[in-house]
Design a protein with these regions (language model features):
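Acceptor-binding helix/loop patch of EC 2.4 sugar-transfer enzymes
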Residues: 72-82, 127-164
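Membrane-proximal helix-turn-helix segments that form the acceptor-binding/catalytic region
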Residues: 93-103, 114-116, 136, 152-176
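Nucleotide-activated donor-binding/catalytic signature segment of Leloir-type glycosyltransferases, i.e.
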Residues: 263-281
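Short hydrophobic beta-strand element within catalytic cores of glycosyltransferases
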Residues: 315-318
Length: 362
């Protein structure tokens, strides 16, 4: 069964939106931007909370949690991706709840909406809407265990405390928006009723377009865009790329690491293979020079980066547990590979190296 598309929110109800990401910053920030601009466009934006609202936007409310920064810098929390993730979202959630004023519809993101939802209920909000940027939390936990079994040297970003909080958010929400059929199916499998689920189609920033001229220098450029972690499948990409022996192949990781362990892992990788480059920052110039974008994630509710690659005319290799696989036409604009299978990634890379897809050579 495919997800429905008719929301229960009245067309004129004013929306208050909350998200930890900065406006337009990363995949989550792009998700926030889409919500804000859609509401602004139809005249229903009451305001939005963000760690970094758009500059000079009167509708944006900056939420500061810097007073708790010492927790992340000087306690054992700094060594735990899961606790850093939980506390970062929870501190913002509590700060938003403390500043929330009466309204009609409240939109929050998973893992950072429980206290805001409870406050919104007390203030008489008619609708509580949860934007799930991930698959169902139980699916995330299963995939995290799978990643840890293969590569146990970096902990995942989800812990049991975060899981319990997110399940409470599911229960309180009147409507849960998901961004892919994969996400929808994981919620159905977990027993969430169809009546509560809605599909939101995420869009790519229009600046992501094919280059005016192809590079054409004989290099085979592989690009990964996103956070550099075990859960995103970076060790799988290393296993595959290290066996791609072509001297014309090069790999660029566009993103940052979140743990010291990953930092050392990347340094070791670069020392052993000078074809590997790390380039945090804007992914657009890298995608416009790429021959393929690989997204080897163990789980992703959507995966904006490979969608941006497709918009640039670049074929993608994504896993079965990447939501944007909805957009992949096998053998036309990319390939879908089994999650956790570096050999399948290598096979597709070798195939693209010897015979590029037509979309990338037109």
């Amino acid at each position: 069964m495919h997800c429905g598309s008719t929301a229960r929110i009245g067309p004129t109800e004013m929306k208050t939106i909350s998200c930890s990401a900065g406006y337009g910053s990363g995949g989550l920030g792009q998700h926030l931007t889409q919500l804000v601009e859609e509401a602004r466009g139809d005249g229903t934006l009451g305001g939005y909370f963000s760690g970094a609202p758009q500059a000079d936007d009167e509708s944006g409310i900056r939420v500061e949690t810097t007073s708790s920064g010492w927790v992340f810098q000087y306690t054992p929390v700094r060594f735990s991706p899961a606790w850093k993730n939980f506390l970062g979202g929870d501190l913002l959630d509590r700060a938003v709840a403390a500043r929330l004023t009466p309204g009609e519809t409240f939109h929050g993101f998973n893992g950072q909406a429980l206290h805001s939802f409870r406050r919104a209920q007390a203030l008489g909000y008619r609708q509580l809407v949860l934007e799930s940027a991930t698959t169902h939390v139980d699916h995330v936990m299963r995939q995290q265990r799978k990643a840890h079994q293969l590569f146990g040297w970096e902990a995942g970003w989800m812990n049991e405390t975060q899981r319990r909080k997110t399940l409470r958010e599911y229960a309180l929400a009147d409507t849960i928006y998901v961004a892919s059929q994969l996400s929808y199916d994981t919620f159905r499998e977990a027993g969430v009723p169809d009546s509560k689920l809605r599909r939101r189609t995420l869009t790519v920033d229009p600046r992501f377009v094919p280059p005016a001229q192809p590079v054409g220098d004989g290099k085979f450029r592989i690009v990964y865009v996103g956070s550099v972690s075990v859960m995103k499948g970076i060790p799988l990409l290393r296993e595959a790329f290290s066996r791609l022996t072509s001297p014309d192949a090069e790999l660029t990781l566009v993103g940052g690491w979140g743990t010291r362990t990953m930092k050392h892992y990347l340094r070791d990788w670069q020392r052993l293979d000078p074809r590997v480059h790390i380039a945090p920052g804007d992914p657009l110039p890298h995608l416009q020079r790429a021959d393929v974008c690989v997204h080897p994630s163990f789980t992703d509710g959507f995966g904006l980066a490979p969608a941006e690659a497709l918009a640039c005319g670049v074929p993608v290799i994504v896993t079965e547990d990447t939501g944007m696989k909805d957009l992949v036409q096998e053998g036309v604009n990319g390939y879908i590979v089994p999650t956790g299978d570096w050999e399948a990634i290598l096979e597709r890379l070798e195939q693209l190296l010897s015979k590029p897809l037509a979309m990338n050579t037109a």
